[in-house]
Amino acid sequence: MNQGKLEVVKQETARVNKDILRISELKWTGMGEFNSNDHYVYYCEQESLRRRNEVALIVNKRVQNAVLGCILKNNRMISVCFQGKPFNIMVIQVYALTSNAEEAEVDWFYEDLQDLLELTPKKDVLFIIGDWNAKIGSQETPGVTGKFGLGMQNEAGQRLIEFCHRTH
């Protein structure tokens, strides 16, 4: 995303009155954070053998002062913790692997996500947002999914449900 596109994204974020925006497939290199006038950008990219898989969170300046910290975990997930009352809020942005990824890569993804969850205090409110590249289907899994999903469940969807059930 070039500077011009970043400005368009920031304008659209303001138009729809959102304070936090997640982005997948950003196409920037490196990792870090920077101030962009009325927004703060956290991003992480590591070039893989297959392609670049970047994630970012763009935070409006209205809530930037509430940021307690950021973890740039890897090119597929980052987290930002916001001070809240009565609880802090942890936002984890993910970009999951596609169904043709190696099983070891998928295991690594969920292990890294588990690491981030373990760093999140139990009392914090947790939001895991992003692109899961999964279809969970319409079958209800009590405590995890409702019966209003779409399509047929795929392997990535089953793996996501299992992860949610274990960590619920």
Positions of predicted regions on the chain:
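A shared catalytic/ligand-binding motif for oxyanion handling
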Residues: 1-168
